[in-house]
A protein has these predicted regions:
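Bacterial N-terminal signal peptides that target proteins for export
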Residues: 2-10
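C-terminal motif of bacterial Sec signal peptides marking the signal peptidase cleavage site
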Residues: 19-22
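Bacterial signal peptide processing site
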Residues: 24-26
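N-terminal "domain-start" segment that seeds a small globular fold
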Residues: 29-62, 87
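Short active-site neighborhood of thiol/selenol oxidoreductases, capturing the structured segment around
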Residues: 61-89
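Hydrophobic beta-strand anchors of alpha/beta hydrolase catalytic cores
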Residues: 70-71, 103, 165
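Structural microenvironment flanking redox-active thiols in thiol-disulfide oxidoreductases
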Residues: 86-146
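Thiol-/selenol-based redox modules, centered on thioredoxin-like
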Residues: 157-197
């Protein structure tokens, strides 16, 4: 009887120790993330939006809470900077396996880039990571308000969209702008992401 009690006590003690260490590790990780974020400027808060993903589901600004997001703008028929930007995002995705990181590519040509067309584009380009969403805003007004709220500007002409990747923290704060076509900017972004994981 005493042996069983000792074994039970030992198992309970191991569980408590494991749980305590997990809590301490989690708190330390949270402090590390806060330390990295405190070094980054806050440019504003992500504006409200409503869009439809390539998988035909609604996505709102509330869905961004609790995760780190990298947001960029593109259009599926773009033959200039969009393929280069998406290649950069593909590389970032391959280098960052964290489930707390999400990627959002928003079309600036909602007339052409329907959710069905975005889904086809995803398949053709072999963008298979489920953390990467392709989004079409409900209408041009929402797209314009969202882009202006992110401080990237809206021209109404898809070919004049921003080449920047925007870092959004887990509280929907805008934390940085990184030119996807500038190696130094991309390296800086990847360095930040490594520290945040």
């Amino acid at each position: 009887m005493l042996k069983n009690y000792s074994k039970l006590l030992l198992v309970a003690l191991m569980f408590v120790t494991f749980f305590f260490n997990a809590c301490v590790d989690s708190q330390e990780k949270s402090k590390d993330i806060q330390s990295v974020l405190s070094e980054l400027r806050v440019y504003g808060t992500t504006p409200d939006f409503l869009g439809i993903t390539d998988s035909q589901t609604e996505l709102t600004s509330k869905d961004l809470h609790g995760k780190l997001w990298l947001i960029s703008f593109f259009f599926a028929s773009c033959g200039d900077i969009c393929p280069k930007m998406n290649a950069v995002k593909s590389k970032i995705i391959a280098n960052n396996k964290s489930d707390s990181l999400r990627f959002l590519s928003i079309t600036v040509d909602p007339e052409t880039d329907t959710p069905e067309f975005l889904s086809k584009h995803r398949r053709e380009m072999k963008y298979s990571d489920n953390r990467w969403l392709f989004l079409r805003m409900k209408n041009d007004t929402i797209l314009q308000q969202f882009m202006n709220g992110l401080l990237v500007g809206y021209s109404g002409n898809p070919e004049n969209h921003s080449a920047r990747i925007i870092l959004i923290d887990s509280k929907s704060k805008i934390r940085g702008y990184f030119d996807a076509l500038d190696t130094k900017h991309v390296d800086s972004l990847e360095s930040i992401l490594r520290k945040l994981q």
